[in-house]
């Protein structure tokens, strides 16, 4: 992908510290994060440069919120929730504390991505999140075995028993957009949002005959796609590009109704004990050389300014093939989730799960 494409992405997002050695009692960072975001060589280099050990707990958005809620924000020094999952949980549970931006090397971030994330994670004038990894949800299709252009194609009768998706909120949102509605525009109207989610839930329940399985982890889906058991699925871009590297017939496609765009952040748990180590890790990770290593491990792009120049050319080419400029304009970036929205979605997902 050309560097101008990265600049273009940064422009779209607009519309939408402390380093060094630690004291003896502060030589450990307790990090809760996503799989593949903490490569061993990056941890080793951080330890060598700062003397700080990194204790990693792998998780996801729901588990992060649950763990931090259970402890009142204790147990970890740094968390990596998606940017849309910070303000709502903070309002409800008080599980985070504000960032001290004087301790962050903000010049290391893509300015527009930093501004967008700050905007979406600000509560009562205080910033709670900084951008790290970003990517999208869309369609992964074996183009030799199926033709799909939007999420609802996963329910086409000719692919009965050969498609997959997660039984999670992104699937509800994707099918809402595919129906021609904008679920994000209804976030502040719970009654209308509940009605839309109810309709979407019925659509997905009626589609269950097409679904081989609701995937729980990426390896489950990757293996199904490799064998041809799955011909089309809703999945993260990184999974699609990994499969494409193995089999050129498998493509990651930006759906007609729009890929869903997410940004995973850095956030400070309310009762973290080692903010100094957390800021050191943030600043270390946003260096272009380190960000490129993390990006290679995750298979996604980062908010680090200049890291794109060090990225794998193959990944850049895959991105360019998946996203025309029109498709980039059509990405639906997740806004902050207001309190109560996930309760509505949870009830719908339970009904889909129970449907025969």
Listing of model-derived features with the role each one plays in the protein:
Residues 260, 264, 269-329:
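Mature extracytoplasmic/periplasmic domains
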Residues 76-81, 214, 231-236, 251:
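Paired acidic/hydrophobic, glycine-rich loop segments that form the ligand-binding mouth/hinge
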Residues 80-222:
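Extracytoplasmic ligand-binding site segments that recognize negatively charged/polar headgroups
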Residues 197-207, 246-270:
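Periplasmic-binding protein-like
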Residues 85-88, 234-249:
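A ligand-binding cleft/hinge motif common to bilobed small-molecule-binding domains
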Residues 325-356:
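Conserved C-terminal helix/tail region of periplasmic/extracytoplasmic solute-binding proteins
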Residues 18-24:
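Sec/Tat signal peptide C-region and signal peptidase I cleavage site
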Residues 25-89:
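Early extracytoplasmic/lumenal segment of secretory-pathway proteins
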């Amino acid at each position: 992908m050309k560097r101008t494409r990265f600049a273009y992405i940064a422009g779209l997002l607009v519309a939408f510290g402390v380093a060094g050695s630690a004291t003896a009692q502060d030589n450990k960072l307790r990090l809760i994060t996503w799989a593949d975001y903490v490569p061993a060589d990056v941890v080793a280099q951080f330890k060598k440069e700062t003397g700080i050990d990194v204790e990693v707990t792998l998780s996801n958005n729901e588990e992060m919120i649950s763990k931090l809620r259970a402890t009142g924000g204790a147990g970890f020094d740094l968390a990596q929730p998606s940017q849309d999952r910070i303000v709502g949980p903070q309002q409800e549970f008080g599980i985070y504390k504000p960032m001290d931006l004087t301790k962050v090397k903000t010049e290391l971030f893509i300015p527009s991505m930093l501004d967008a994330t700050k905007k979406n994670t600000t509560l009562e004038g205080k910033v709670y999140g900084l951008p790290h990894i970003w990517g999208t949800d869309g369609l992964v299709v074996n183009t030799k075995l199926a033709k799909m252009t939007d999420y609802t194609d996963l329910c086409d009768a000719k692919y009965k028993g050969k498609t997959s998706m997660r039984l999670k909120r992104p699937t509800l949102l994707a099918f809402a957009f595919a129906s021609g509605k904008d679920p994000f525009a209804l976030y502040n109207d719970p009654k209308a949002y509940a009605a839309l989610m109810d309709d979407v839930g019925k659509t997905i329940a009626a589609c269950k005959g097409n679904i081989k399985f609701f995937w729980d982890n990426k390896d489950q889906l990757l293996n199904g796609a490799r064998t041809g058991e799955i011909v089309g699925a809703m999945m993260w871009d990184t999974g699609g590009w990994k499969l494409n590297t193995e089999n050129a017939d498998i493509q990651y496609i930006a759906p007609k109704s729009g890929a869903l765009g997410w940004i995973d952040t850095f956030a400070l748990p309310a009762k973290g004990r080692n903010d100094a180590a957390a800021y050191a890790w943030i600043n270390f990770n946003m260096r272009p050389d380190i960000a490129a290593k993390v990006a290679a491990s995750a298979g996604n792009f980062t908010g680090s300014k200049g890291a794109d120049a060090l990225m794998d050319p193959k990944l850049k080419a895959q991105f360019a093939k998946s996203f025309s400029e029109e498709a980039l304009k059509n990405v639906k970036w997740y806004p902050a989730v207001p309190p109560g929205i996930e309760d509505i979605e949870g009830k719908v997902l339970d009904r889909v799960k129970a449907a025969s």
